[in-house]
């Protein structure tokens, strides 16, 4: 069950409107770099929903971002879905309730449970790293691109098996509390740049739900590494930001890049 919950927790939800706070403690989330003679590609691991209680867009991360000519995210959420009041139902994605998500009601239920657990810890996509970066790029007039189309992500989610959420109120409450605690632990690890804290979770996911792991991590990380390898053939500076879980474990983007003979270095 928890494998599907975690899968939902570290994928890209629709972003909200960022709220800027001052005098927050510094965080140092992991930043990597790939480069050759005329190309620099930064690889940043994001946390899609944060509590806004740390300042992470600073130091090496901000310097790398400001020196980049393009931001590349996992996907670009359509503008009409970025509105705070946009309904988060299948209709909001241009589909009927009984459509591409018809076979994944359980997965949608799981996703709602994950969002609820995150909210209980004050986490919101309004503070998420992807949202902050996208808004900063828009403000700076920086081009923004996606590694995947939004339609591809919807199709992927529609194929993922979900977990049957407990119907008993007491059991559901314990499940929510456990998930909220885990999300808080992962956020803390992200804040301190401890990317390998995500690896045991990924190992558990691969063991319990190999199909989810294959679709969401192994295959996508391979495609993204291939994209980076191709992009190195063009000059320029690019800031690539993907979920931190994709930079951890034996099938990380860095590991996939190594299969192309491409070395990844930690910046911070």
Each PLM stretch: what is its role?
Residues 1-2, 130:
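Generic alpha-helix initiation/capping and coil-helix boundary signal
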Residues 214-268:
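A cross-kingdom marker for long, charged
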């Amino acid at each position: 069950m928890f494998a599907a919950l975690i899968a939902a927790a570290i994928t890209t939800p629709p972003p909200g409107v960022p709220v800027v706070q001052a005098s927050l403690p510094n965080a140092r989330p992991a930043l990597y770099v790939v480069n050759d003679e005329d190309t620099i590609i930064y690889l940043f691991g994001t946390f899609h929903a944060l509590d806004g209680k740390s300042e992470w867009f600073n130091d090496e991360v901000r310097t790398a971002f400001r020196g980049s000519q393009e931001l590349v995210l996992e996907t670009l959420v359509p503008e009409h879905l970025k509105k705070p009041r946009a309904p988060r139902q299948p209709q909001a994605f241009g589909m009927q309730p009984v459509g591409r998500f018809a076979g994944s009601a359980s997965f949608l239920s799981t996703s709602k449970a994950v969002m609820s657990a995150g909210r209980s810890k004050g986490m919101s996509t309004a503070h998420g790293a992807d949202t902050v970066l996208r808004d900063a790029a828009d403000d700076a007039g920086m081009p923004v691109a996606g590694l995947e189309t939004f339609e591809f992500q919807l199709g992927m989610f529609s194929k993922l098996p979900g977990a049957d959420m407990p119907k008993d109120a007491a059991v559901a409450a314990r499940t929510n509390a456990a998930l909220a605690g885990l999300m808080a632990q992962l956020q803390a690890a992200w804040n301190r740049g401890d990317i390998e804290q995500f690896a045991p979770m990924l190992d558990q996911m691969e063991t319990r739900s190999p199909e989810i792991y294959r679709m969401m991590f192994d295959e996508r990380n391979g495609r993204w590494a291939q994209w980076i390898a191709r992009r190195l053939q063009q000059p320029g500076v690019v800031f690539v930001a993907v979920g931190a879980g994709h930079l951890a474990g034996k099938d990380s983007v860095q590991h996939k890049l190594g299969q192309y003979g491409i070395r990844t270095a930690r910046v911070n």
